[in-house]
Amino acid sequence: MIVIDKECEAVSRLFAKKSVRLKVPVGVKSENPIFQRKGSSFNLKSLREYQPFDDLRQIDWKLYGRTDRYYIKEFYEEENERFFLLVDSSASIPIFGRDYYLCFVASLAFIFLRLHFTLNMLSFTNRLESSCMNIKEHRAIPRVLGFLDSLEFNGRTDLVQVMQTVRERYQPTTLFLFSDLFDRRLTLEHLQGFRRVFLLHFFTPFSSLSLRHSEIEVEDRETRQRLLLPNNPVARREIESLERQFLGRFYRSRRGYHYLQLERTKERVPFYWRILETLYD
């Protein structure tokens, strides 16, 4: 059973009065004089054409009567972003800890829905596996939990291919990637093309492992290959050096790029707070 952190309700209330929404309305390109009227309420709103995912109740029927076209009126406080949550469901994730991982994703999604963001969730291995799209309002949290609970965690990771597919198919503005990043080919260049990326790295450091024998048998959950390694100071130093090289790819300062490293021993709530502070900055 996936449990949402109890602090999420309080965290979402604290940020509810802030705004990360668009500061200016979306312009409607039209020569119809109705959009040029001075002193009318139209100058205070964003107007856009109706799209299939919109609620029919949001259609401005008075405007339809004047223009014979369907428009949605959005007040400043109603405009929000659509976040894409890309969830790794490959076989290596349970090594980190399935419960911690799913709790984190579910809790962050809960907060976003409480703050009236729209979510699109995609799971992946070496390809996109499943989706749960256009999730709105906190009443839809059962959809999030059902989606996460259905993940099977098998198969290999191919982040390079998946990121390319997401970029070409969906063109998201803000992307949250939840993964252990088990793809040595992945670099920050593969994250270009997204205006804002949150890379949430679920990481198990080598130093946290309790190793008591002189040799270690390591199994790659994704390939099912086994490797026998010596457990001595020289071998440990070499592994830790490779680990630092691996992590070094992600410690970059770049506009719109945010890297957070999570470990099973770390509290989750401070990470929710950091993400929200970044969004509301």
How would you describe each model-predicted region?
Residues M1-V26, S30-F35, E189-D281:
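Von Willebrand factor type A / integrin I
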Residues R139-T174, R185, H201-T204:
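Von Willebrand factor
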Residues S89, L177-F182, F203, E263:
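Structural motif
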Residues N120-K136, F147, R156-Q164, S179:
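Short, surface-exposed recognition loops or helix-turn segments adjacent to catalytic cores
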Residues I93, V162-Y170, L186-F194, F250-R254:
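Alpha-helix C-terminal capping segments
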Residues M1-M133, T174-F176, R184, H190:
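An amphipathic, basic-hydrophobic helix/alpha-beta surface used to engage anionic
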Residues E137-G146, S253-Y259:
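Short, electropositive alpha-helical surface patch
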Residues C103-S107, R143, Q245:
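Long, highly charged amphipathic alpha-helices
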